[in-house]
């Protein structure tokens, strides 16, 4: 099952990629009642807490309560139909977090979170309570006991399942009423695909045995580096390691358990130019264990580079809106493809009255230059020795992760599918993903862009200068790093995207040195932007981040080479009017942070 991030994220038509947007980084630095139609209450167990070894207590309770609910919920008539599908998805995660700011530890904790998402479907796969705008009526979420007490877990599941049935029944009755008065839908696909049950080895629950003391020292030292840069007035260094096991059982017979292990170090810093523009830099390092994160020397070098970059950005000129040639670095290109292309290839975007359906009717048609191919492969845990955040073994509907070739030689082949069918693709391909508390939808995992027209990056730079000269432009742009972006995909908004760069240079055609600039966002429409790609570099780069959409925030990766585009449009960034701090900071000490 996909790694599930246990935190709330508001559903929105904006799709955000990245460790965080600039606004989110700055923020870090600075049920209606239902009638319950109850299943029988579970019988009391004679065994107490810890009577069953993990995961037997949890998995046993899931199996038992699922079977009881399927046999006893509903009366089988039109007013109280029996469920045709029921599933329990449990996220069981232990995490250790250490944070430092201004050279001192501000947080050092270990936490254990166990949540269940219960999905109840009434009607039939052809049409059920999730139809149309009622998709979330199938879902009920709640915390589960952390102890392996089968009685406590069973009672929690019993209560939540009853709530879930009431919610599903309310949605089902609304769907039936609406179908009598609405016009025929353009896409008459079913609401739930038919899939083969999946089983995997049942794994032990998560365990985490880590000494936080060495990491308290490491994050303290890294945070203290920013004291050398008086204009950097906000910083945060956070280390987190998570051990997670996700369980999925369904009335179809699926029974899977998927482990997840991730260690992440995030370094963030904030400054402000004299004109009030906020400036943010962030670096994220990820591995499958703390031992595989970069050593302290490498991290210190990166931290110093961030401080120097912010100092330079404060003095850089604000660039004007631009429409002309540009190079996006590999990381920048990866975010670009994630936002501009990836979201529009998610299955649920191909049906419904609200979606713009940019590529819905273009299967088998060319949508990219013929030298580009795009796949999404969540089965890859790493690439060239670097961890990929978008890796998972089973998705959040219990389907095995699969490589999906989305575009071959520029031609669109398929979409990223959950178990919500669309007219052109009726089956899941293992991309039904969700954050805890959200309904799964088709989402990206590891989006990988490859090119058959790759040149060394020095040659790509020469091609940029030549293209700028051809267009009579005094310079082209080079986007070195990008923080985040979003895409608008609904019909009631422009079919547009915005990508937020952090480091941008003007590359002059007359031989002048490259000039660092600030205050620019990349904007545009997807088809125009994608068809302006002229060539790519010969080295792939990786972007690891978190992406938010209607099914919540999920970990993603995008892999791409640098690319040259003939036309890219930029606009001025929003600029604040707050002054930098008037009072100078206290003098830095000579040590490595507070003890």
Regions flagged by a language model, labelled:
Residues 390, 450-528, 544-550:
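Hydrophobic alpha-helical bundle architecture
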């Amino acid at each position: 099952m996909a790694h599930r991030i246990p935190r709330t994220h508001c559903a929105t038509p904006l799709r955000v990629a990245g460790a965080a947007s600039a606004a989110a980084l700055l923020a870090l630095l600075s049920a209606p009642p239902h009638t319950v139609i109850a299943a029988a209450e579970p019988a009391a167990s004679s065994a107490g807490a810890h009577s069953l070894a993990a995961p037997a207590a949890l998995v046993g309770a899931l199996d038992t309560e699922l079977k009881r609910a399927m046999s006893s919920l509903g009366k089988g008539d039109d007013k109280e139909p029996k469920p045709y599908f029921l599933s329990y998805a449990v996220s069981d995660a232990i995490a250790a977090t250490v944070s430092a700011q201004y050279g001192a530890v501000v947080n050092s904790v270990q936490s254990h979170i166990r949540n269940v998402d219960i999905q109840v479907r009434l009607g039939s796969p052809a049409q059920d309570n999730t139809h149309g705008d009622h998709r979330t009526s199938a879902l009920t979420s709640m915390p589960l006991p952390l102890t392996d007490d089968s009685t406590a877990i069973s009672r929690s599941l019993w209560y939540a399942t009853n709530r879930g049935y009431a919610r599903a029944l309310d949605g089902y009755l609304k769907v039936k009423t609406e179908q009598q008065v609405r016009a025929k839908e353009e896409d008459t696909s079913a609401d739930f695909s038919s899939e083969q049950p999946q089983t995997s080895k049942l794994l032990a629950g998560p365990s985490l045995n880590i000494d936080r003391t060495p990491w308290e020292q490491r994050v303290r030292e890294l945070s203290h580096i920013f004291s050398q840069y008086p204009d950097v007035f906000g910083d945060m260094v956070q280390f987190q390691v998570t051990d997670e096991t996700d369980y999925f059982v369904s009335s179809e017979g699926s029974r899977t358990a998927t482990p997840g292990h991730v260690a992440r170090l995030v370094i963030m810093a904030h400054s402000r130019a004299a004109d009030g523009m906020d400036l943010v830099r962030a670096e994220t390092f990820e591995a499958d264990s703390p031992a595989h994160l970069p050593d302290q020397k490498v991290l210190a070098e990166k931290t110093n580079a961030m401080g120097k970059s912010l100092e330079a950005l404060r003095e850089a000129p604000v660039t004007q809106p631009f429409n002309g040639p540009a190079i996006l670095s590999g990381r920048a290109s990866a975010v670009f493809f994630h936002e501009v292309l990836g979201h529009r290839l998610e299955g649920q975007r191909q049906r419904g009255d609200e979606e713009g359906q940019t590529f819905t009717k273009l299967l088998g048609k060319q949508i990219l230059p013929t030298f580009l191919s795009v796949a999404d492969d969540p089965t890859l845990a790493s690439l060239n020795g670097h961890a990929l955040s978008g890796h998972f073994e089973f998705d959040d509907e219990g389907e095995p992760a699969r490589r999906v070739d989305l575009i071959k030689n520029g031609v669109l082949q398929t979409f990223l599918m959950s178990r919500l069918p669309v007219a052109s693709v009726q089956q899941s391909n293992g991309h039904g993903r969700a954050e805890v508390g959200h309904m799964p939808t088709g989402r990206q995992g590891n989006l990988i862009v490859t090119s058959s027209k790759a040149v060394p990056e020095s040659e790509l730079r020469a091609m940029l200068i030549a293209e700028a000269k051809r267009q009579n432009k005094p310079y082209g742009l080079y986007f070195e790093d990008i923080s985040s972006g979003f895409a608008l995909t609904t019909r009631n908004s422009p079919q547009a995207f915005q990508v937020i760069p952090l480091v941008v240079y003007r590359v002059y055609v007359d031989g002048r040195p490259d000039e660092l600039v600030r205050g620019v966002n990349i904007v545009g429409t997807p088809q125009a932007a994608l068809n302006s790609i002229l060539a790519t570099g010969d080295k792939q780069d990786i972007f690891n981040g978190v992406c938010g959409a209607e099914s919540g925030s999920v970990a993603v990766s995008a892999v791409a080479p640098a690319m040259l585009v003939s036309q890219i449009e930029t606009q001025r960034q929003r600029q604040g009017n707050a002054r930098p701090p008037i009072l100078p900071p206290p003098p830095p000490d000579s040590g490595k942070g507070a003890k």
